[in-house]
Each structure stands twice: as C-alpha cells, then as structure tokens.
Regions:
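Acetyl-CoA-dependent GNAT
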Residues: 2-73, 78
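Short hydrophobic/aromatic beta-strand or adjacent loop that forms the aromatic wall/cage
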Residues: 46, 135-139
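Residue-level recognition of the GNAT/N-acetyltransferase active site
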Residues: 66, 83, 87, 116
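Conserved beta-strand-loop-alpha-helix junction that forms the acyl-donor binding cleft
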Residues: 113-122, 141
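Conserved acetyl-CoA-binding loop of GNAT-fold acetyltransferases
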Residues: 127-136
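Short beta-strand-to-coil "C-cap" segments at the C-terminal boundary of structured domains/repeats
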Residues: 141-147
Length: 149
C-alpha cells in the first residue's frame, strides 16, 4: 500500500462515491450525488483530508476553522472515518497528524473533535492520540420542518 494524504477543498470526482460509502458505513446513508452537492456548499475555509492509495479512498477527515466570538483558537475535526477493513492500520493516526498540522498552519492552538457516546473504539483511539475527554458540554438538536423546495 502506498498511502498518501491529500488535503483539498474539492476532492476529485473519482472519490465522491467512495466518500458516500464511508459515510454510509457510519450509519448515515448517503449517495454520490449527495456528496457532490454537499461539497459545493461547504464553507470556504473547510478542508478534507483524503487517505488514498492510488484511486482508492481508505479514509477521510473533514476539517473546519470557524471564526466566532468564543473559540477563535479552535479548529474542529467535523468527521473522521477510516474504511472498516483498513482500521487499526495507522490510517487514522496519519489523518489526525495531518489535521493537527493543518490546524497549526491555520493559526489555531486547539483541535476539537466530537464522537458519539456509543463509539467506544473511537474514544480509545482518540485517547491514545493524546486527546482528553471534555465532558463540559451537552449537545442538543431539534429537527426543523423545511419548506418545500
């Protein structure tokens, strides 16, 4: 395997279907067309890190720098996923390292990531990478009715 980490805002089309598959593996059914549309809507400062072996996508991380009144020094890993059959092979570590480099180059002092409470293998992975659990926040969500388009 010749793993490369690509940093991009607009990944090549050959990876769109594979991104949809990775997101679907995590319990969020997604189609290629959804990915193509969502990529065009991402904030301009967002970046994707793609772990690739040639034209095969093995994992990705979605990164965000948000400028707000409270957390100006923080960048966020919005999502990080490694293809199931390639987990525990160092790809996640390479993605996290690349995310930290990007955050530092973006002038940030912290990198935040969130993970579902049921994803205990991910918790162990992030702890092993030196991340500390921050239990000071609770996330609330409400589904909103959208007008028909």
């Amino acid at each position: 395997m010749e793993l490369q980490i690509l940093r991009t805002r607009h990944p090549p089309d050959i990876y769109h279907a594979q991104l949809a598959n990775l997101i679907s593996q995590e319990g969020h059914p997604t189609k290629r067309e959804d990915i193509t549309n969502r990529l065009h809507l991402l904030p301009t400062k967002d970046r994707l890190l793609l772990a690739v072996d040639g034209e095969t996508l093995l994992g990705y991380a979605h990164l965000r720098v948000s400028d707000d009144l409270v957390n100006e020094e923080t960048a966020e890993v919005v999502a990080i996923v490694v293809e199931v059959s390639n987990r525990r092979s160092g790809i996640g570590t390479r993605l996290i390292t690349a995310a930290e480099t990007w955050a530092t180059q973006s002038g940030r002092a912290r990198l935040l990531l969130k993970t579902d409470v049921v994803r205990t293998p991910a918790h162990a992975f992030f702890s092993a990478q030196g991340y500390e659990k921050d239990s000071t926040t609770i996330e609330f969500i409400r589904n909103l009715d959208r007008p028909n388009s």
